[in-house]
Every structure is written in structure tokens, then in C-alpha cells.
């Protein structure tokens, strides 16, 4: 049995397989996932697990060079935006319309669905390189 880090086998496998500039997405319970995009559904109940719980655990094992967020998070969920900025203080942020963020999920290696119930709690992580 694995002793530490990400214990969910699907999430651990996706993170371990990420290369430089690959994309991984994490989102709220309501985010539609395009056909063909691997969906890892961790949602157990409302707010279980939360978006930030999953993001923080993924960040322990994945180098991030850039993130993509919906423009709408600035006005509709500024508290979550601040949480994201605190978790990724030195990472470039690119904002785009929510409709474009949804379309870009098709380019991600996987979408991790959380139990998050706050609007626009969705992110695309662009993998960095550790050397």
C-alpha cells in the first residue's frame, strides 16, 4: 500500500504521467466535461471534497508553471480566486471566458470532479518541469 502523497490510484496515475506543458483540470461538481476527456469523479457529497482540498494535494506532487481560470471568478467568486492565488503565489494566471475554459477541458489529460458548490471553481493546471 502506498504510504503518502496522493492515494487515489487514478489521480496518482494521471499526475505521475504528466509531462512539461501538459494540462490537468480540477473543478466543481457542476462543470460539464467534454466527451472523450477522462473524468475522475471524487465527489462524495456537497463540498466533499472541496476544490481547494484537491488542488492543494495535487500541488504537493505536481510542478505548475501556469494556470487558466474563468474571467467570471473575479466577480462571482473572489474568495476562491484569492485561495488559488495563495496556493500558487508565483504562478502565471491566464483568464478566459468560462465558455472557453469549458472548451479547453478537451485538451486536458483528465478532469478531476470535486464536491465544490461555489461558482467558477474550475482550473486548468499547466505542468512545469522540475529541472
UniProtKB/Swiss-Prot annotation:
The active site is at residue 20. It catalyses: beta-D-ribopyranose = beta-D-ribofuranose. GO terms for cellular component: cytosol. It is an enzyme of class 5 (isomerase). It is found in: Cytoplasm. Coiled coil: none annotated. Transmembrane segments: none annotated. GO terms for biological process: D-ribose catabolic process. Catalyzes the interconversion of beta-pyran and beta-furan forms of D-ribose. Homodecamer. This is D-ribose pyranase. It comes from Limosilactobacillus fermentum (strain NBRC 3956 / LMG 18251). The gene is rbsD.
Amino acid at each position: 500500500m502506498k504510504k503518502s502523497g496522493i492515494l487515489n490510484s487514478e489521480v496518482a496515475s494521471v499526475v505521475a504521467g504528466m509531462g512539461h506543458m501538459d494540462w490537468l483540470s480540477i473543478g466543481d461538481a457542476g462543470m460539464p466535461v467534454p466527451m472523450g476527456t477522462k473524468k475522475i469523479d471524487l465527489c462524495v457529497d456537497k463540498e466533499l471534497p472541496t476544490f481547494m482540498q484537491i488542488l492543494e494535494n495535487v500541488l504537493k506532487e505536481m510542478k505548475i508553471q501556469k494556470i487558466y481560470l474563468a474571467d467570471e471568478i473575479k466577480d462571482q467568486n473572489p474568495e476562491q480566486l484569492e485561495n488559488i492565488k495563495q496556493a500558487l503565489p508565483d504562478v502565471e494566471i491566464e483568464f478566459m471566458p468560462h465558455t472557453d475554459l469549458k472548451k479547453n477541458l478537451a485538451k486536458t489529460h483528465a478532469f478531476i470532479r470535486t464536491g465544490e458548490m461555489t461558482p467558477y471553481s474550475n482550473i486548468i493546471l499547466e505542468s512545469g518541469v522540475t529541472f
